[in-house]
Amino acid sequence: MSVDGCLSALLTRGLVRTRPAADMLAPSSLLSESGAPLPLDHARLLSLSNGLDAYGGYFRVFGVGPWSVRDMRRWNAPEGWRRAWDGRADGWWFIGETAWGDQYAYATGDDPLEFDATVYRLDACRLEAEPVAPCFADFLRDELARNATAPRDETTVAARRRFGDLEPSVQLTYVPSLLAGGDEDLAHVVELGAREAMTLAGDSYRAVAAVAAATA
């Protein structure tokens, strides 16, 4: 199914919230500072909707510029939340996320002509990556559409019942973090701004890694 067909099906079923179309001729439409453009299927979506969110804001696809779901270039800025991860966010261009902070991303390299269109998911605790789709169109059709209909993660379903719909600028995070030994109980989940949540997750990862290194 094409990007157009997939988006139309999602809209017909009321499964996503869209934004006005992006200007894909603007400099902000570039993939990264190296100048690699977005894959054509990804650019096509943004030319129809400048990002989107699904399942009440629990799954997000970023856009470009200030009127998007979230501006990819600002989100990927090295001086932002990525700095807290001590290099673990390097080599990735983040294009979306779940409400828990799991990031969807492309792997990036030095040569923009050798671009890998595979979409990866990086978990919010360690930024460990796994491929979820060979291209953006498949990501939209499979990963996003499936979760927009019925998320496979029961905790996400329970969280929506507890917290309701979320703004795309907000993430849910466990306090204390699961990595630091926190309980996987929704009573310990709070809403934070996405940048603050990802920074705290990076700080937690570094602290746990430092303890592990010291006791090795």
Residue ranges: model-predicted function:
Residues 1-106, 110-111, 161, 165-216:
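A surface-exposed partner-binding patch
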Residues 115-152:
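Compact, glycine/acidic-enriched structural inserts
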Residues 144-172:
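Short aromatic loop motif centered on NTY/YTY
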